């Protein structure tokens, strides 16, 4: 084994040398020598998580630039104060009063100089923006008869008009929040249509950042509102200094941060590599932390635990196979059950995830506070004999679509699709696999012309509340949308989910969520496949690494120790 690893390391060094010869935009040397480089992927990268695709990836950059009203404490349902110092809820559960923090300053950048501190108007603007309608207090941008002589100006205007908030749309936030008003400079009232215990968790998710209303108004006055999403201004521990598209983001310490000042002045977020490329850079000390490493190569770290270490945590995610209920054949429960019994999920975990994931026998990940140890065993686990008996004589030909992009919950989507195809072939089912892009799938769903029987997908949550985990992917309100790819609608499921948010007692909420989960596992609109661990590797000189179940990392706590190797 040692001889094999030495050969691999020799091969790796050759790769490193060849990579160094390739021309590509590079980070200035003085920054890499006087800061920390964090290697991650560029998939789905955006400076505005409000508009990012829901359930795909955690944006570590915006976690450093912006703050939220609340954060989530450890692996619990407890909220910790951020921009909101405290809150109270009315007796009828329909009003939330937020008391905001004083003395918080927005970033001063080449594109914006704030004239005031953070206050209630910023909260009102930020929440109203995702509620949509006419609540944003900004001019409408849907001008259809306006022409622009400058093509770049036209593109910016068109981009600004594409206001979509996938996560908040998926949880129907505009059907939960009736109004948001400032009662004083540091007090905000949120009025709900009905009591909803999940609201504060949603406001603690990665998507619920707080913008500067003053900055947005300035951009609107200049007819340049699109810049709100491309030139960020926040209150976080770091602010943006440079950005090279799909290559790197340079962050510099916010000297006026309201919490303890970050220890490292410069952070480079390298977006330029794939999974194996990140490990190459990591071993070459071109980055001191690498996220989403190639799991098949993680064993290399075990040979040198003096210089490197790995950190992992259970993730709030789920990879699954969805049945398209718009197809009559997929509404046959016996067929769905037999397809589930044909899948060797343990083989997928071993071959694709290299045991950095566990077989998912539930919908709610174990890391959630609502996860129950009393959930019944998954009824439709691998049983190829039963599957073949039920399916062999049906002569089925099924279309399996797979979104052609790597995600936390699915590092090799096409390979998993091929393994599913092979398993189903053993049961006598023919499968045609088709890789599709996310924009193509979105267009097909919009036209209700999606022609798949099965689709491989997954979900990644930004908080530990099952409302933001199960409602987007399984509720009637999201049928025929990008989140609910099964197009399943079950009123009893929705009733369980609604019951869970009408009480503030965690035990009652967990009971309702688990009843909803048991219904899903019986009806089987989706087959759970894997819960994936969040993994990163770090140089032993880097300390203060604390990763959350969502994959986020607070750069402000990172620091170097002085050992030299």
UniProtKB/Swiss-Prot annotation:
Transmembrane segments: none annotated. PROSITE patterns: SBP_BACTERIAL_5 (PS01040). One of its GO terms (biological process) is protein transport. It holds the Pfam family SBP_bac_5. GO terms for cellular component: ATP-binding cassette (ABC) transporter complex; outer membrane-bounded periplasmic space. InterPro entries: Peptide/Ni-bd, SBP_5, SBP_5_CS, SBP_5_dom. Residues 1-23 form the signal peptide. Belongs to the bacterial solute-binding protein 5 family. Involved in a peptide intake transport system that plays a role in the resistance to antimicrobial peptides. This is Peptide transport periplasmic protein SapA. It comes from Haemophilus influenzae (strain ATCC 51907 / DSM 11121 / KW20 / Rd).
């Amino acid at each position: 084994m040692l001889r094999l690893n030495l050969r691999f390391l020799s091969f790796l060094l050759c790769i490193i040398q060849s990579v160094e010869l390739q021309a590509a935009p590079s980070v200035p040397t003085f920054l890499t020598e006087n800061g920390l480089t964090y290697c991650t992927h560029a998939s789905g990268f955006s400076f505005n998580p409000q508009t990012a695709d829901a359930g795909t990836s955690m944006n570590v950059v915006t976690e450093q630039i912006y703050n939220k009203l609340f954060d989530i404490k450890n692996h619990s349902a407890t909220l910790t104060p951020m921009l909101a110092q405290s809150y109270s809820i009315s007796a009828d559960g329909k009003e939330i009063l937020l008391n905001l923090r004083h003395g918080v300053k927005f970033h001063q950048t080449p594109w914006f100089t704030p004239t005031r501190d953070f206050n209630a108007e910023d909260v009102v603007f930020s929440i109203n923006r995702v509620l949509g309608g006419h609540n944003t207090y900004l001019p409408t941008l849907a001008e259809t008869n306006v022409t622009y002589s400058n093509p770049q100006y036209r593109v910016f205007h068109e981009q600004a008009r594409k206001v979509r908030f996938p996560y908040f749309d998926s949880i129907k936030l505009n059907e939960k929040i009736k109004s948001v008003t400032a009662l004083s400079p540091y007090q905000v009232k949120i009025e709900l249509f009905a009591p909803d215990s999940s609201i504060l968790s949603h406001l603690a998710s990665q998507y619920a950042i707080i913008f500067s209303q003053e900055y947005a108004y300035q951009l609107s006055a200049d007819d340049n509102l699109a810049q709100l999403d491309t030139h960020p201004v926040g209150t976080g521990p770091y602010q943006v200094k440079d950005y090279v598209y799909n290559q790197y983001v340079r962050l510099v310490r916010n000297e006026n941060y309201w919490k303890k000042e970050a220890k490292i002045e410069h952070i480079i977020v390298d977006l330029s590599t794939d999974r194996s490329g990140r490990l190459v850079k990591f071993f070459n000390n071109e980055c001191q932390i690498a996220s989403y490493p190639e799991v098949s190569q993680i064993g290399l770290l075990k040979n040198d635990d003096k210089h490197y270490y790995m950190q992992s945590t259970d993730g709030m995610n789920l990879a699954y196979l969805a049945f398209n209920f718009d197809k009559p054949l997929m509404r046959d429960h016996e067929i769905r059950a037999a397809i589930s019994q044909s899948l060797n999920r343990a083989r997928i975990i071993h071959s694709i995830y290299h045991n950095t994931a566990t077989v998912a026998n539930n919908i709610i990940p174990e890391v959630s506070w609502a996860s129950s140890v009393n959930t019944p065993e998954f009824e439709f686990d691998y049983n190829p004999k039963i599957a073949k008996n039920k399916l062999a004589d049906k002569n089925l030909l099924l279309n399996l679509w797979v979104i052609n992009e790597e995600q936390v919950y699915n590092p090799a989507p096409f390979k998993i699709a091929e393994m599913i195809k092979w398993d189903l072939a053993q049961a006598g089912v023919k499968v045609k696999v088709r890789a599709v892009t996310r924009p193509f799938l979105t267009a097909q769903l919009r036209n209700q012309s999606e022609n798949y029987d099965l689709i491989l997908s997954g979900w990644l949550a930004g908080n530990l509340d099952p409302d933001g985990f199960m409602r987007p992917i399984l509720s009637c309100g999201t049928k025929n949308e990008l989140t609910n790819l099964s197009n399943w609608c079950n009123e009893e499921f929705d009733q369980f989910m609604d019951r869970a948010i009408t009480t503030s007692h965690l035990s009652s909420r967990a009971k309702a969520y688990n009843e909803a989960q048991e219904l899903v596992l019986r009806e089987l609109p989706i087959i759970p496949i894997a819960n994936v661990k969040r993994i990163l590797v770090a140089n032993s000189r880097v300390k203060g690494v604390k990763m959350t179940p969502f994959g986020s990392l607070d750069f402000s706590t990172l620091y170097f120790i002085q050992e030299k190797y």
